[in-house]
Amino acid sequence: MAVKEIKYYAEAREKIMAGVDTLADAVKVTLGPRGRNVVLEKSWGPPTVTKDGVTVAKEIDLEDKFENMGAQMVKEVASKTSDVAGDGTTTATILAQAIYRAGSKLVSAGHNPMALKRGIELAVAAAVRELRNMSKPTKDQKEIAQVGTISANNDVAIGDIIAEAMNKVGKEGVITVEEAKSMETTLEVVEGMQFDRGYVSPYFVTDPERMEVVLEDPYILINEKKISNMKDLLPVLEQIAKMGAPLLIVAEDVEGEALATLVVNKLRGTLKVSAVKAPGFGDRRKAMLEDLAVLTGGKVVSEDIGVKLENVSLQDLGRAKTVRIDKDNTTIVDGAGARSAIEARVKQIRAQIDETTSDYDREKLQERLAKIVGGVAVVRVGAATETEMKEKKARVEDALNATRAAVEEGIVPGGGVALLRCLPALEKLDLHGEDAFGVKIVMRALEEPVRQIANNAGHEGSVVVQQVKQGTGSHGFNADTEVYEDLSAAGVIDPTKVVRFALQNAASVASLLLTTEAMIAEKPKKQKPAPAMPGAGMEDMY
């Protein structure tokens, strides 16, 4: 069994502080519009350049096991804030460092860490209430663009693209970020329901120049199983031929005799028809076919519910205004489903999103929801080099997360001012003894983001903090223009959700560290020197 090494009391706290400082000092240089980049060495490929706090934090592992424990705990603050709010990781790290530093001094001076923890929790609860009172909902696309711009390190183009994407697909829509093949950053919006299945045969193409199938006002047959026997398909094809309308077949697969007959009839001009494979696999495929049926007002042909393909009538088929199919994707625009049925389906998917514990399932459910209600927007990020593209893509993802958070819970003044404006609420807390010291720890920590933003801009942090404290509302220091002004009017705003989670997560981990009095780690094993190589009887040879 491995031998353990134990550190107690002041020695343990010093080790934690060293680890916290090492990680936080590397992360906090990135804060604010004048924050610097951090270069990360990779085991393969070029180094990564980033200004994202959580990316820097995740790269840090320290040689000293006790210091590393402190660093890993603060890394957890950044990761948790990133997972839940999507941004604010640097702020969270700075707050955790400030709370632990002030608290550990008081513990060393003889204060009770459990009472300090209680005071910290009461102070954070009061600050969160004040943030919620301060918060305002996002009014328009301009404010969403401002949030995105601030989060993307003052890149106005990124802010505008994300605001446009949010405007096009709504807050329920899915916005994905991909690497472009050119130097331009562009936005592509897919309206309607799109899934990643193309035509089964290129013979179905109606636009040879673009290699696309375009069907106007088609009927849509949704079949759960494979279709290979023409006899099963014949009754519905006869009804469609009489109507003279186009037909889209969505099935697990269309093959053999059935596919050959469809292709021949399409080439002769007897039928306007196309076939695509059903999206997804297993239970997810069933759910997506049901979504498609609800959206188009049709029914899923499935033997599970006693419906056979040969018995299908036109009433069982879905309708849509337009269907576009290329070799990779199918897009269905303006499905004819009943509004009430679509709303019921949306409500059901939202309930599943709330209930699921799997991040993967939640992501897939949100994609399904977006396809029914909003649509999908793709931001294609372009840059001159691969290194720049990766850095820019990370900033776009940060900005996207921040704008979603802003739409969800509203916005507060940026630049660390919102946290400073919580100080009067903390001063009003009527606490005595050790609890009051816990509140003072948080009050000191709330100044730290403004101080660090000013330091990174080349100003004296303490002077800036005092100046901002004398103001009211959203009056603060704009580190980009280096002037004191109304930050909300200047477009320097933060999502309430991001600021709230940064404070709550920082206080949670820092107060846990404060109550630590012993640390246990595996003792490093002494490496035995390798034995000398034998001379093999050749010592005297030169």
UniProtKB/Swiss-Prot annotation:
Subcellular location: Cytoplasm
Chief localization: cytoplasm
CDD domains: GroEL
Residues holding ATP: T30, L31, G32, P33, K51, D87, G88, T89, T90, T91, G415, D494
This enzyme's EC code(s): 5.6.1.7
InterPro entries named among the record's database cross-references: Chaperonin_Cpn60_CS, Cpn60/GroEL, Cpn60/GroEL/TCP-1, GroEL-like_apical_dom_sf, GROEL-like_equatorial_sf, TCP-1-like_intermed_sf
Catalytic reactions on record: ATP + H2O + a folded polypeptide = ADP + phosphate + an unfolded polypeptide
Record's keyword annotation contains Chloroplast: no
GO cellular component: cytoplasm
Record's keyword terms, sorted: ATP-binding, Chaperone, Cytoplasm, Isomerase, Nucleotide-binding
One function term, GO molecular function aspect: isomerase activity
Family per similarity comment: Belongs to the chaperonin (HSP60) family.
Role: Together with its co-chaperonin GroES, plays an essential role in assisting protein folding. The GroEL-GroES system forms a nano-cage that allows encapsulation of the non-native substrate proteins and provides a physical environment optimized to promote and accelerate protein folding.
Subunit record text: Forms a cylinder of 14 subunits composed of two heptameric rings stacked back-to-back. Interacts with the co-chaperonin GroES.
Record NCBIfam families: GroEL (TIGR02348), PRK00013.1 (NF000592), PRK12849.1 (NF009487), PRK12850.1 (NF009488), PRK12851.1 (NF009489)
HAMAP family assigned to the protein according to its UniProt record, in alphabetical order: CH60
Protein name, UniProt field: Chaperonin GroEL 2
Species this protein is from: Syntrophobacter fumaroxidans (strain DSM 10017 / MPOB)
Gene: groEL2
